[in-house]
Amino acid sequence: VNISKEIITQNNSMLSLLDVARNVAKSKSTMMIQSESGTGKELLANYIHENSDRAKRPFVAINCAALPETLLESELFGHAKGAFTGAVQDYRGKFEQAHTGTILLDEISEMALPLQAKLLRVLQESQIDKVGGKDPIPVDVRVIATTNQNLMGMVDSGKFREDLFFRLNVIPLSLPPLRDRME
């Protein structure tokens, strides 16, 4: 069954998940997509965005595992001119770029604890602080996070903030592994 231009499936568990995803897409709540690597978490996040009231707004994805902590902070929240060596102009981070749309925080489990605290503040207050910036900037963003890890286990071992976990895991979605959907 051709569900969207990117998703084609006949798997009953996938069809059921996509039905749930379509139904929760209109919600403003944060979502957590958990699954093994390579199962299509970003495709599902994009599908949710395309079926939401924000569909005509930006969809911005960032892989939290791909950047070191200092660079990830600047990429997420932006930086002011002169904030650090090489910051020759203001930079709009991913949250500003996604304003009124959706941001996908891919592999959220790889985010360092200090940055998790800053992300939690953004989720609580709907505003960002640019690196080296003076004033907070309001943002209206739907957040979808993904992980291939057991985040609750990471919470238990002190590697992921419990408050952030519950703030992100408002609507949990789990993609079945590829080995369970051979069709």
Label every model-predicted segment.
Residues E6, D19-T85, E96-A112, D140, ...:
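Conserved post-Walker A coupling segment in P-loop NTPases
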Residues S4-E6, Q10-L15, A25-K26, S52-R57, ...:
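Nucleotide-binding/hydrolysis machinery
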Residues Q97, V122, A145, R167:
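Conserved catalytic core of Hanks-type protein kinase domains
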Residues H99-T102, K118, V139-I144, R161:
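Loop/turn-to-beta-strand initiation segments
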Residues E107, A145-N150:
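A short beta-strand-to-loop transition that corresponds to the Sensor-1 phosphate-sensing loop
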Residues K81, P114-P138, N148-D156:
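Conserved catalytic/switch belt of AAA+ P-loop NTPases
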